[in-house]
Each structure stands twice: as C-alpha cells, then as structure tokens.
Swiss-Prot record:
Belongs to the ponericin-Q family. Keywords: Antibiotic, Antimicrobial, Secreted. GO terms for biological process: defense response to bacterium. This is M-ectatotoxin-Eb2b. Transmembrane segments: none annotated. Its main location: secreted. The lineage of its organism: Eukaryota, Metazoa, Ecdysozoa, Arthropoda, Hexapoda. It comes from the Eukaryota. It comes from Ectatomma brunneum. Expressed by the venom gland. It is found in: Secreted.
C-alpha cells in the first residue's frame, strides 16, 4: 500500500520541487 502511495506521490512532489526551483 505505502509503496503504491509513494510511487503515486513521488512524481507530483518532483514536479512541485522543479516548479519551485524555476521560480527561484
């Protein structure tokens, strides 16, 4: 269960981090 949950959230988190980095 947790593995699937993390796998589902990881991409969203990565996208969010990239967006924050772009905003600087």
């Amino acid at each position: 269960f947790w593995g699937a949950l993390v796998a589902g959230l990881a991409p969203k988190v990565a996208i969010g981090i990239k967006a924050i980095n772009k905003k600087g």
